[in-house]
Regions:
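Gly-rich Lys/Arg/Thr-decorated short loops/hinges at beta-loop-alpha junctions or inter-strand turns
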Residues: 108-116, 139-144, 185, 203, ...
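Iron-sulfur-associated redox domains of electron-transfer enzymes in respiratory
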Residues: 1-75, 215-502
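Glycine-rich adenosyl-nucleotide cofactor-binding module
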Residues: 110-131, 160
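N-terminal [4Fe-4S]-dependent radical SAM core
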Residues: 89-118, 135
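Acidic, serine/threonine-rich, charge-biased low-complexity segments
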Residues: 74-83, 93-96
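Iron-sulfur cluster-binding cysteine motifs and their immediate structural context
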Residues: 126-149, 157-194, 199, 203-218, ...
Length: 502
């Protein structure tokens, strides 16, 4: 589903575009009216996807609030759509948790963990499903298998033995996508997010076919700041390759960003280069010598938050190096002390990373590639038609640019170790998706991954599979590998280790 330009994606993009237009164009006098008009602009005279225009507009209204960085309205009392808007109309507005929220009016209350016999059942003589059920929940009704839901324990044995694959396992897509089991049910049977478990990776959001889960955005605040002429510098994550069209070159992408009003553009891969060298040094001095049994990378915030939440004894094993986003932002602020910094990337959880008190002074805005597309649309900018800008002087290495794909972080550190510490044996592990990350952390906890550098990526495929991406994984992976292979130099200089950014 993620490879397709679904109506869910189209609606989200329309919302982002409308919000960005208000930030760019609306006056203080017209802003409230313009915001209130968005649900009517999105849903005109007929409902396309739900039973009435009123429900569709109600859902669109909640999307508008989240896109402006506001929380959903309570269901038990009347709150105006624009309540809180004036307080959010400032450049310094940060996200207020929770970041990920279920829109109740959009949720279809999908059935969860249910086995059901489909019309594919042939009513065969063998009846393996009936024989294998440990609770006698299956009987023959009108010549077909039937599952008594009151007796079923959801073990799945019937499905496993059916020769016709006639038994369906119904799961909530959002629940199936969540690697930390944070999706639960409310009293209405609708999905709800246990915020104590959630690590804000956004996989539930991109897996819901009803678009019932959404995150908050700073697109309104950013577009308003750009309109005001604030000096804003963009730091772009290396996963930007292929996100705005297969034929869009890095130079055209930079040109499109300049047209939006960004005064300069830096690659986040620069910060990755710094981290790569520092992590290699840390591994050589601490892990290879046995002072630390293993070292966990920290560039993926959902991965590091999960490690802290679910494996608190491992906190000291999480790398303390600056993440690429923060390291790059500090380079920018060092060179442009009066500028604001926006991180543009594929990641939803970077929004929470930027909320940390230790990061707030470094990163002023975080938007995803999906939200950036809304900014481009609001300004009628098409990256593929923009002029080619030459590569900036602060170009990153192949190692840093490769951070965007699963295994790229560990691979870059491994290559630095082999180059700069050739006598040290290197043990590398990497995991992608939170479910796999939990498995590898369990192995580390059991002492089965000693003297090891462990890379974790919450999103399947790494950053290029993030919740805020526009393009499918397969084509992006191919394009990114081509870009990395053509990048020079291959490795960062050891001198970066001495760069003072703290």
């Amino acid at each position: 589903m993620r490879n397709l330009d679904t109506p869910v994606k189209q609606i989200r993009r329309k919302i982002f575009t409308e919000i960005a237009k208000i930030g760019f164009e609306s006056t203080d006098e017209s802003m409230i009216h313009d915001i209130e008009s968005i649900p009517y602009n999105i849903v005109e005279e007929r409902a396309k996807y739900r039973e009435s225009i009123y429900r569709e507009r109600a859902v669109a209204s909640e999307r508008v609030r989240l896109a402006m960085g506001l929380s959903l309205r309570p269901e038990n009392r009347s709150v105006h759509l624009t309540d809180g808007v004036k307080a959010s109309n400032i450049d310094e507005k940060y996200y207020e948790p929770p970041l990920m929220q279920v829109i109740p009016s959009a949720c279809s209350a999908c059935e969860s963990n249910k086995y059901e016999v489909s019309n594919m059942c042939r009513g065969c003589v063998a009846h393996p499903c009936l024989l294998t059920c440990p609770k006698g929940a299956i009987s023959m009704v009108n010549g077909k298998s039937f599952i008594d839901q009151d007796k079923c324990i959801h073990c799945g044995r019937c499905k496993a033995v059916c020769p016709y694959d006639a038994i369906a396992h119904k799961e909530r897509p959002c629940e199936r996508a969540c690697g930390v089991k944070a999706i639960e049910s409310d009293e209405q049977g609708r999905a709800s997010i246990n915020q104590d478990k959630c690590v804000s990776c956004g996989m539930c959001m991109v897996s819901c076919p009803f678009g019932a889960i959404s995150d908050k955005s700073q697109i309104f605040q950013l577009s308003h700041a750009l309109r005001e002429g604030t000096e804003i510098i963009a730091e772009i994550a290396p996963a930007y390759i292929n996100q705005f069209g297969e034929d869009v070159t890095p130079g055209q992408f930079r040109s499109a960003l300049k047209q939006l009003g960004f005064s300069n553009i830096y690659e986040v891969a620069l910060g990755a280069d710094i981290g790569c060298i520092s992590e290699a040094h840390h591994y050589a001095k601490e892990v290879a010598t046995g002072h630390l049994p293993f070292l966990l990378t920290s560039c993926c915030p959902s991965w590091s938050v999960m490690a802290k939440k679910y494996f608190p004894a491992m906190i000291d094993n999480i790398s303390q190096e600056l993440t690429p986003m923060v390291a790059t932002a500090r380079i920018v602020k060092k060179e442009h002390p009066h500028a604001k910094v926006v991180f543009i990337g594929p990641c939803a959880s970077k929004k929470l990373e930027a909320m940390r008190h230790s990061v707030r002074s470094d990163v002023d805005f975080v938007i995803t590639f999906e939200e950036l597309w809304g900014l481009f649309d609001a300004k009628s900018i098409t990256p593929s038609t923009c002029e080619e800008l030459p590569e900036e002087t602060q170009a990153a290495t192949a190692a840093g640019r490769g951070y965007a794909i699963a295994g790229g972080v560990a691979g870059a550190i491994e290559n630095c170790l082999k180059e700069y510490y050739p006598d040290i044996p290197v043990h590398i592990e990497h995991a992608e998706s939170l479910a796999e990350c939990k498995k590898v952390l369990t192995l580390a906890k059991a002492g089965k991954l000693k003297n090891c550098m462990i890379e974790g990526m919450a999103c399947p495929g790494g950053c290029i599979g993030g919740a805020g991406t526009n393009a499918g994984f397969a084509k992006t992976s191919k394009a990114l590998k081509k870009y990395v292979d053509s990048s020079e130099p291959k490795l960062p200089s050891q001198e970066l280790e001495n760069l003072e950014l703290n």
